[in-house]
Regions:
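Conserved active-site segments centered on acidic
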Residues: 1-81
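Conserved beta-strand segments of alpha/beta enzyme cores
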Residues: 36, 65, 107-109, 153
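Phosphate-binding/catalytic loops
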Residues: 84, 90-150
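Short beta-strand scaffold positions
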Residues: 87-88, 181
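Positively charged, polar, low-complexity stretches
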Residues: 151-230
Length: 230
Protein backbone atom coordinates (compact mmCIF):
# COMPACT_ATOMS: atom_id res chain seq x y z
CA UNK A 1 0.00 0.00 0.00
CA UNK A 2 1.23 3.49 -0.92
CA UNK A 3 0.39 6.39 1.39
CA UNK A 4 0.32 9.83 -0.25
CA UNK A 5 -0.05 13.23 1.44
CA UNK A 6 -0.62 16.24 -0.81
CA UNK A 7 0.55 19.54 0.67
CA UNK A 8 -0.06 23.21 -0.09
CA UNK A 9 -0.06 26.46 1.90
CA UNK A 10 -3.59 26.48 3.31
CA UNK A 11 -5.13 23.08 2.43
CA UNK A 12 -8.27 24.68 1.04
CA UNK A 13 -7.56 24.78 -2.74
CA UNK A 14 -4.73 22.91 -4.42
CA UNK A 15 -3.86 20.09 -2.04
CA UNK A 16 -7.48 19.05 -1.33
CA UNK A 17 -8.14 19.19 -5.07
CA UNK A 18 -5.19 16.84 -5.59
CA UNK A 19 -6.39 14.59 -2.75
CA UNK A 20 -9.86 14.12 -4.20
CA UNK A 21 -8.77 13.96 -7.84
CA UNK A 22 -6.26 11.24 -6.95
CA UNK A 23 -8.89 9.36 -4.96
CA UNK A 24 -11.20 9.48 -7.98
CA UNK A 25 -8.49 8.27 -10.37
CA UNK A 26 -7.62 5.42 -8.01
CA UNK A 27 -11.32 4.51 -7.79
CA UNK A 28 -11.68 4.47 -11.58
CA UNK A 29 -8.56 2.32 -11.83
CA UNK A 30 -9.93 -0.14 -9.26
CA UNK A 31 -6.94 0.39 -6.98
CA UNK A 32 -8.62 1.75 -3.83
CA UNK A 33 -7.11 -0.92 -1.59
CA UNK A 34 -3.60 -0.04 -2.74
CA UNK A 35 -3.56 3.64 -1.72
CA UNK A 36 -4.16 5.90 1.28
CA UNK A 37 -4.55 9.53 0.18
CA UNK A 38 -4.88 12.71 2.27
CA UNK A 39 -3.82 16.37 2.25
CA UNK A 40 -2.49 19.00 4.65
CA UNK A 41 -1.30 22.61 4.97
CA UNK A 42 2.12 24.00 5.74
CA UNK A 43 0.49 27.00 7.49
CA UNK A 44 -2.10 27.31 10.26
CA UNK A 45 -4.09 30.05 8.51
CA UNK A 46 -7.10 27.98 7.42
CA UNK A 47 -7.23 25.21 10.02
CA UNK A 48 -10.71 23.68 10.25
CA UNK A 49 -12.00 25.48 7.17
CA UNK A 50 -13.66 23.56 4.31
CA UNK A 51 -12.45 23.48 0.73
CA UNK A 52 -12.69 26.98 -0.75
CA UNK A 53 -16.12 27.28 -2.46
CA UNK A 54 -14.88 28.06 -6.02
CA UNK A 55 -12.51 25.07 -5.88
CA UNK A 56 -15.30 22.93 -4.48
CA UNK A 57 -17.55 23.97 -7.37
CA UNK A 58 -14.95 23.01 -9.98
CA UNK A 59 -14.54 19.61 -8.37
CA UNK A 60 -18.31 19.16 -8.32
CA UNK A 61 -18.51 20.07 -12.03
CA UNK A 62 -16.26 17.07 -12.65
CA UNK A 63 -18.33 14.76 -10.47
CA UNK A 64 -16.05 14.88 -7.43
CA UNK A 65 -17.47 15.39 -3.93
CA UNK A 66 -15.14 16.81 -1.28
CA UNK A 67 -17.80 17.26 1.42
CA UNK A 68 -16.47 16.97 4.96
CA UNK A 69 -12.88 17.88 4.12
CA UNK A 70 -11.41 20.51 6.44
CA UNK A 71 -7.93 21.97 6.51
CA UNK A 72 -5.37 20.44 8.85
CA UNK A 73 -1.73 21.30 9.38
CA UNK A 74 1.27 19.21 8.44
CA UNK A 75 2.73 17.28 11.39
CA UNK A 76 6.29 16.03 11.89
CA UNK A 77 4.89 12.52 12.27
CA UNK A 78 3.55 12.71 8.70
CA UNK A 79 7.05 12.09 7.37
CA UNK A 80 7.08 8.64 8.95
CA UNK A 81 3.42 7.91 8.23
CA UNK A 82 3.40 8.66 4.48
CA UNK A 83 5.46 7.26 1.63
CA UNK A 84 5.19 10.41 -0.49
CA UNK A 85 4.58 14.01 0.57
CA UNK A 86 3.80 15.97 -2.57
CA UNK A 87 3.90 19.77 -2.73
CA UNK A 88 2.32 22.13 -5.21
CA UNK A 89 5.17 24.65 -5.51
CA UNK A 90 8.69 25.41 -4.34
CA UNK A 91 7.47 27.29 -1.26
CA UNK A 92 5.62 24.17 -0.13
CA UNK A 93 8.76 22.12 -0.76
CA UNK A 94 10.91 24.55 1.24
CA UNK A 95 8.45 24.55 4.15
CA UNK A 96 8.34 20.75 4.19
CA UNK A 97 12.13 20.47 4.16
CA UNK A 98 12.26 22.89 7.08
CA UNK A 99 9.53 21.02 8.98
CA UNK A 100 11.23 17.66 8.52
CA UNK A 101 14.83 18.90 8.81
CA UNK A 102 15.55 17.86 5.25
CA UNK A 103 14.40 14.83 3.28
CA UNK A 104 16.58 11.93 4.34
CA UNK A 105 14.26 9.29 2.84
CA UNK A 106 13.59 11.10 -0.45
CA UNK A 107 9.85 11.35 0.16
CA UNK A 108 9.29 15.01 -0.77
CA UNK A 109 8.14 15.55 -4.36
CA UNK A 110 6.73 18.35 -6.52
CA UNK A 111 3.48 17.28 -8.19
CA UNK A 112 4.15 18.59 -11.69
CA UNK A 113 7.55 16.90 -11.79
CA UNK A 114 5.57 13.72 -12.50
CA UNK A 115 4.13 15.39 -15.60
CA UNK A 116 7.58 16.26 -16.94
CA UNK A 117 7.18 19.88 -15.81
CA UNK A 118 10.09 19.83 -13.41
CA UNK A 119 10.03 22.58 -10.81
CA UNK A 120 6.78 24.09 -12.10
CA UNK A 121 4.08 25.15 -9.67
CA UNK A 122 0.45 24.12 -9.74
CA UNK A 123 -1.36 27.41 -10.42
CA UNK A 124 -2.54 28.87 -7.10
CA UNK A 125 -6.14 30.02 -7.65
CA UNK A 126 -6.11 32.05 -4.44
CA UNK A 127 -4.05 34.54 -6.43
CA UNK A 128 -4.82 33.75 -10.08
CA UNK A 129 -8.58 33.21 -9.58
CA UNK A 130 -8.27 30.70 -12.42
CA UNK A 131 -9.68 27.58 -10.82
CA UNK A 132 -10.01 25.82 -14.18
CA UNK A 133 -6.24 26.09 -14.72
CA UNK A 134 -5.65 24.69 -11.26
CA UNK A 135 -7.93 21.76 -12.14
CA UNK A 136 -5.95 21.14 -15.34
CA UNK A 137 -2.61 21.21 -13.51
CA UNK A 138 -3.81 18.97 -10.70
CA UNK A 139 -5.40 16.46 -13.07
CA UNK A 140 -2.29 16.23 -15.24
CA UNK A 141 -0.03 15.79 -12.24
CA UNK A 142 -2.25 13.18 -10.59
CA UNK A 143 -2.71 11.18 -13.80
CA UNK A 144 1.05 10.99 -14.24
CA UNK A 145 1.54 10.18 -10.57
CA UNK A 146 -0.88 7.26 -10.89
CA UNK A 147 1.02 6.07 -13.95
CA UNK A 148 4.37 6.35 -12.17
CA UNK A 149 3.15 4.38 -9.17
CA UNK A 150 1.01 1.73 -10.84
CA UNK A 151 1.67 1.76 -14.59
CA UNK A 152 -2.02 2.61 -15.08
CA UNK A 153 -3.16 5.12 -17.69
CA UNK A 154 -6.81 6.21 -17.68
CA UNK A 155 -8.05 6.99 -21.19
CA UNK A 156 -11.14 9.13 -20.63
CA UNK A 157 -13.61 9.40 -23.52
CA UNK A 158 -16.50 10.68 -21.39
CA UNK A 159 -16.28 14.25 -22.70
CA UNK A 160 -15.73 13.29 -26.36
CA UNK A 161 -18.39 14.39 -28.86
CA UNK A 162 -16.43 13.72 -32.08
CA UNK A 163 -14.22 10.88 -33.32
CA UNK A 164 -11.33 13.32 -33.65
CA UNK A 165 -11.63 13.98 -29.91
CA UNK A 166 -11.24 10.26 -29.22
CA UNK A 167 -7.91 10.34 -31.03
CA UNK A 168 -6.97 13.55 -29.23
CA UNK A 169 -7.39 11.77 -25.91
CA UNK A 170 -5.41 8.76 -27.17
CA UNK A 171 -2.53 10.99 -28.24
CA UNK A 172 -2.50 12.83 -24.91
CA UNK A 173 -2.52 9.69 -22.82
CA UNK A 174 -0.37 7.29 -24.85
CA UNK A 175 2.04 10.01 -26.03
CA UNK A 176 2.93 8.23 -29.24
CA UNK A 177 4.79 9.93 -32.07
CA UNK A 178 2.98 12.60 -34.10
CA UNK A 179 3.61 10.84 -37.42
CA UNK A 180 1.40 7.90 -36.41
CA UNK A 181 -1.95 8.09 -38.18
CA UNK A 182 -5.37 8.50 -36.60
CA UNK A 183 -6.85 5.12 -37.48
CA UNK A 184 -7.42 1.78 -35.79
CA UNK A 185 -4.57 0.00 -37.59
CA UNK A 186 -2.14 2.67 -36.42
CA UNK A 187 -3.47 2.40 -32.87
CA UNK A 188 -2.90 -1.37 -32.93
CA UNK A 189 0.67 -0.78 -34.14
CA UNK A 190 1.25 1.64 -31.27
CA UNK A 191 -0.11 -0.77 -28.68
CA UNK A 192 1.82 -3.78 -29.98
CA UNK A 193 5.11 -2.40 -31.20
CA UNK A 194 5.70 1.34 -31.07
CA UNK A 195 6.76 3.23 -27.93
CA UNK A 196 3.91 4.58 -25.81
CA UNK A 197 3.08 5.37 -22.21
CA UNK A 198 1.50 2.96 -19.76
CA UNK A 199 1.43 -0.75 -19.06
CA UNK A 200 -2.22 -0.98 -18.03
CA UNK A 201 -5.06 0.98 -19.57
CA UNK A 202 -8.48 1.81 -18.18
CA UNK A 203 -10.87 3.12 -20.85
CA UNK A 204 -13.81 5.30 -19.81
CA UNK A 205 -16.37 5.18 -22.59
CA UNK A 206 -18.42 8.11 -23.97
CA UNK A 207 -21.58 9.00 -22.08
CA UNK A 208 -24.98 7.80 -23.26
CA UNK A 209 -25.81 11.23 -24.71
CA UNK A 210 -22.71 11.26 -26.95
CA UNK A 211 -23.36 10.91 -30.70
CA UNK A 212 -24.02 7.33 -31.75
CA UNK A 213 -21.07 7.22 -34.15
CA UNK A 214 -18.73 8.33 -31.35
CA UNK A 215 -20.00 5.66 -28.97
CA UNK A 216 -19.71 2.98 -31.64
CA UNK A 217 -16.21 4.06 -32.63
CA UNK A 218 -15.11 4.10 -29.00
CA UNK A 219 -16.32 0.51 -28.82
CA UNK A 220 -14.08 -0.35 -31.76
CA UNK A 221 -11.15 1.32 -30.00
CA UNK A 222 -11.91 -0.76 -26.92
CA UNK A 223 -11.71 -3.91 -29.04
CA UNK A 224 -8.35 -2.85 -30.46
CA UNK A 225 -6.99 -2.53 -26.92
CA UNK A 226 -8.34 -6.01 -26.15
CA UNK A 227 -6.86 -7.47 -29.34
CA UNK A 228 -3.51 -5.92 -28.44
CA UNK A 229 -3.58 -7.67 -25.08
CA UNK A 230 -4.62 -4.82 -22.80
Amino acid sequence: MTKILFVCHGNICRSPAAEFVMKELVRIAGLETEFVIASAATSDEELGNPVYPPMRRVLKEHGIDCAGKTARQLRRSDYEEYDLLIGMDEENMWNMRRKFHGDVAGKLKNLLDYAGREGEAVADPWFTRDFAQTWDDVLEGCERLLEALSGTVIVDFTACAEISELYGELRRKLRYESWVGDNLDALYDVLTGLPHRGTRFVLRMPLDDAPTEVRLYAGRIHRVFADAGY
